[in-house]
UniProtKB/Swiss-Prot annotation:
InterPro entries: ESCRT_assembly_dom, Helix_hairpin_bin_sf, Mod_r. Residues 1-49 are annotated as: Disordered. The keyword Transport applies. Belongs to the VPS37 family. The lineage of its organism: Eukaryota, Viridiplantae, Streptophyta, Embryophyta, Tracheophyta. Residues 137-217 form the VPS37 C-terminal domain. The keyword Nucleotide-binding does not apply. One of its GO terms (cellular component) is ESCRT I complex. Residues 21-47 have a biased composition (Low complexity). This is Vacuolar protein-sorting-associated protein 37 homolog 1. It comes from Arabidopsis thaliana (Mouse-ear cress). Residues 8-20 have a biased composition (Polar residues). It holds the Pfam family Mod_r. Component of the endosomal sorting required for transport complex I (ESCRT-I), composed of ELC, VPS28 and VPS37. Interacts with ELC.
Amino acid sequence: MFNFWGSKDQQQGQSRPQEASSQSPWYSPSLVSSPSSSRPQSSGQISAQVSPGEAAGIIVFLKDKSVDELRKLLSDKDAYQQFLLSLDQVKVQNNIKDELRRETLQLARDNLEKEPQIMELRNQCRIIRTTELATAQEKLNELERQKEEILKFYSPGSLLHKLQEAMNQVDEESEALQEKFLEKEIDTAAFVQKYKKLRTTYHRRALIHLAAKTSNI
């Protein structure tokens, strides 16, 4: 009998690499390479930075797992994904993402529901601009026109002109009264009283007119 132990060991040694190759990990080997053997990353590669606190939290979940379970996580992508989704940190992030998605959808629904109301408000604003605003603008223009007329009526030049007309009117009345007196149409007492009153009014207006012309008005 020949000793085939050596050949058996050799055959087992040859079969093990084949088994290992059939269970090659889904991740890149560079992810678990030691720092001393790792090569500098190119500019196109992205390195995931994990804080010490996060790493410690993940180790807590891994420390109770068996070697076979850890190997399965490294070789089975689905198992790794399931483990990743079971982490509290990932659950919190997923919950936040789901909540934000729900809130965004709700805001979109609310905006769609308010679309008819927004259109109605736009129509009302357009009506106001074309009707009520036009009426108010017309009234404002009328008030502006009245204001200009009032300012023009009471302007210094207009007042001086009216005062001059009043002076001329009194002067004409005085001359007419003199003619009546000369023609004996009025007695002396009545003439003096009326004529004095007219001339007093005339001179008072004349003084006001002169003062207004020489002032800064």
